[in-house]
Amino acid sequence: MKRVMFVDDSPNVLSGLRRMLHKMSNEWEMEFAEDARTALAMMAEKPFDAIVSDMRMPGMDGVALIREVKRRSPRTARIILSGVVDQKEIAESLRETHQFMPKPFRPKALRATLARISGLDAYLQDEKIRDTVAQLDTLPSFPSLYFEIMKELDAPDPSLEKVAAIVAKDPGMTVKLLQIVNAASLGLARRFSNPVEAVQQLGIAAVQSLALSAHVFTCFESRAFKGFSITKLWDHGANTARIARKILEIERADAALAEDAYTAGMLHDIGKLMLANNLPEPFQRALDLTQEKGIRFLAAEEEVFGANHAGVGAYLLGLWGLPTTIVEAVAFHHQPSRSEAPTLGPLTAVHVANVLEHELSESKIIGCEPKLDLDHLAALGLQDRIGVWREQIVRMFQPDDE
């Protein structure tokens, strides 16, 4: 049974939480504390899977509490309840917490958030990797895109369109801005999944402040991996995004689903980015195993990490509160038949796009030769559409003068 801690200096709020969550007592063991020090004392006695804390409290405030929880118990999911709408303050707090929730909050939204977090362990079983992922507060950007966006944002009159276009090419920037915009949109029914919409929602002034003052963007450190190119990884993500969106456009799917497919396609290998940036030595060992044993990179990851990049990426995105459609597309992009996707959507589009991009790419990535999940496609009645998609995608990538 999952264990959750709620912290608020208002006895009335805690009493309301008890009543609201009473029906969930068969799923979660819940504890309640009126101040940070009491919460930390309780956490010293037993571990907690999640902590939900008010932001503004006397003495040690919510951010300081969450920071200490992060230090003591990295894998504990951290959520702040707040009425703050200042994007910079939210961004700075998101260095410590994983998600924000509005205060006053909607009971259904809080229950849904806790349920989503409770289910993330299915994507990533290894506790050491969970600890590493849970401590992240940003993901690095491709160097050329990082310097391009910083130059544009530092200009006297930066262009919102140019900034949005740059963000839409980079998984690290996309994930961070989606995390912030979904936190800043306190209480809105929708969750943002499109990087361009995220930039538009925040506005150019806020993005400037976030990048230049709060430093939410970082640059990927130059590392030389044998058998792996970070440039190829970025190119593959960008192409997969375009292909995934095109597949849903061909099938006349809802425009919002097509945009979700684009975002999921760009982010589908974000677990590789996290592993390469934060665990470079074991990541290189996994790369070496693909050559030494002639195995796929997925199998090599499992041997070295006890996890693979799909699960790592899904765990991170879910922890940061990205929409479930994106999380599931990342989690199951190699084996969509393991999911419960009943219809053609972002998951299937990203799965097929990943395979087609590898087929059509001139620069192959060692150990990465994904295969189509034909059982999944047959279950959706789509096995006869593969040739149509492939023909259209080949045409899409042909130079204009051909």
Each language-model region and where it sits:
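Two-component/phosphorelay signaling modules centered on CheY-like receiver
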Residues: 11-31
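Alpha4 helix (beta4-alpha4-beta5 surface) of REC/receiver domains from two-component response regulators
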Residues: 64, 84-101
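Receiver (REC) domain active-site loop signature in two-component systems and cognate sites
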Residues: 57
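Active-site residues of response regulator receiver
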Residues: 8, 54, 82
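Conserved phosphotransfer cores of two-component systems
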Residues: 24-25, 44-46, 68-76, 96
